[in-house]
């Protein structure tokens, strides 16, 4: 259970960071 929870937490963090980077890149391109 612990490994599954940590895996999902890592996956969620990776998705959040990726989406934040994509939004930042799109904003920079719009400027």
From Swiss-Prot:
Predominant localisation class: plastid
Keyword match Plastid: yes
TM stretches of this protein: 4-24
InterPro entries recorded: Cyt_b6/f_cplx_su6 (IPR007802)
Topology within the bilayer: Single-pass membrane protein
Keywords attached to this entry: Chloroplast, Electron transport, Membrane, Photosynthesis, Plastid, Thylakoid, Transmembrane, Transmembrane helix, Transport
Compartments it resides in: Plastid, Chloroplast thylakoid membrane
Gene Ontology terms, MF aspect: electron transporter, transferring electrons within cytochrome b6/f complex of photosystem II activity
Quaternary structure note: The 4 large subunits of the cytochrome b6-f complex are cytochrome b6, subunit IV (17 kDa polypeptide, PetD), cytochrome f and the Rieske protein, while the 4 small subunits are PetG, PetL, PetM and PetN. The complex functions as a dimer.
Family from the record: Belongs to the PetL family.
Annotated function: Component of the cytochrome b6-f complex, which mediates electron transfer between photosystem II (PSII) and photosystem I (PSI), cyclic electron flow around PSI, and state transitions. PetL is important for photoautotrophic growth as well as for electron transfer efficiency and stability of the cytochrome b6-f complex.
The protein's name: Cytochrome b6-f complex subunit 6
Name of the gene: petL
């Amino acid at each position: 259970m612990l490994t599954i929870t940590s895996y999902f937490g890592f996956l969620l963090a990776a998705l959040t960071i990726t989406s934040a980077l994509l939004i930042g890149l799109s904003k920079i391109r719009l400027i």
